[in-house]
Regions:
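Conserved N-terminal beta1-alpha1 strand-loop-helix module at the mouth
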Residues: 1-91, 97-111, 116-124
Length: 127
């Protein structure tokens, strides 16, 4: 299945003076059509509540919403996929869990990382 991967990604961050919701709204207003929610500081319950808010903003703007690392939440929220920053993640197990319809991306820091992910054929994009 061919998936659309935007060329303009915005990654939210845990910032002291700007919430993920504010960052998402500003990014969408600026033309971003791919939002990667990168929150590493909240409980699953807090994440789910915030993801619902982000999904509403993304839906309003026609933007794709990708979660960083929290693939276990995909069946509880309206997000289109997950991005794994752990180069050693079990991409086969993650792909099996999330299914073929969800987007799966992975971070790469070396050419070896890129080769391993590409050879496995399980990720939709490498960043």
């Amino acid at each position: 299945m061919k998936k659309y991967i935007s060329k303009f990604h915005y990654l939210t961050q845990d910032l002291p003076n700007r919430s993920h919701v504010e960052q998402t709204r500003i990014a969408c207003e600026a033309g971003a059509n791919w939002i990667q929610y990168r929150c590493l500081s909240k409980t699953d319950e807090e994440l789910i509540a915030e993801i619902h808010e982000l999904a509403a903003i993304c839906d309003d703007w026609g933007a794709t919403l990708i979660l960083t690392k929290h693939f276990h939440l995909l069946d509880q929220v309206d997000a289109q996929g997950v991005h794994m920053e752990d180069m050693k993640a079990d991409f086969k197990a993650i792909r099996n869990q999330i299914g073929a319809d969800k987007t799966l991306g992975g971070s790469a820091n070396t050419f070896e990382d890129i080769g391993r992910m590409d050879q496995a054929g399980l990720v939709d994009y490498i960043g």
